[in-house]
């Protein structure tokens, strides 16, 4: 299973959506929504970038989440996306302190 396929399935389950509901909410045709989402989750087909963007909106995750290889990186992307602008600045400052000159 590809990283993209795995992340789509994880985010869908986390959101509590069926494959059909996710496909419909992302703008797929009613007759093929479930089948297409199933194929994406199995890694048999790769969704176009514009569909990945729509999935990210429906599932409330950043599009980059779908391409994160490591699970902790994927989780970090979700958490970072939920921060406000000021919180992001604070986090980046703290990360710079922690990393120093690494």
What are these regions (language model features)?
Residues 44, 48-65:
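DNA major-groove recognition helix of helix-turn-helix/homeodomain DNA-binding modules
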Residues 1-14:
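A short, Lys/Arg-rich alpha-helix, primarily the initiator
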Residues 16-39, 54:
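Short alpha-helical DNA-recognition segment
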Residues 26, 41, 51, 67-70:
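DNA major-groove recognition helix of helix-turn-helix
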Residues 70-102:
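Interfacial/linker helices and their anchor residues that mediate assembly or domain coupling
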């Amino acid at each position: 299973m590809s990283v993209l396929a795995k992340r789509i399935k994880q985010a869908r389950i986390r959101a509590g959506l069926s494959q059909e509901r996710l496909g419909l909410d992302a703008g797929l045709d009613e007759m093929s929504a479930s089948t297409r989402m199933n194929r994406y989750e199995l890694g048999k087909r790769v969704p176009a970038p514009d569909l990945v963007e729509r999935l990210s909106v429906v599932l409330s995750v950043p599009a980059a989440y779908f391409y994160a290889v490591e699970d902790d990186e994927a989780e970090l992307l979700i958490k970072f996306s939920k921060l406000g602008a000021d919180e992001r600045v604070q986090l980046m400052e703290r990360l710079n302190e922690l990393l120093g000159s690494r």
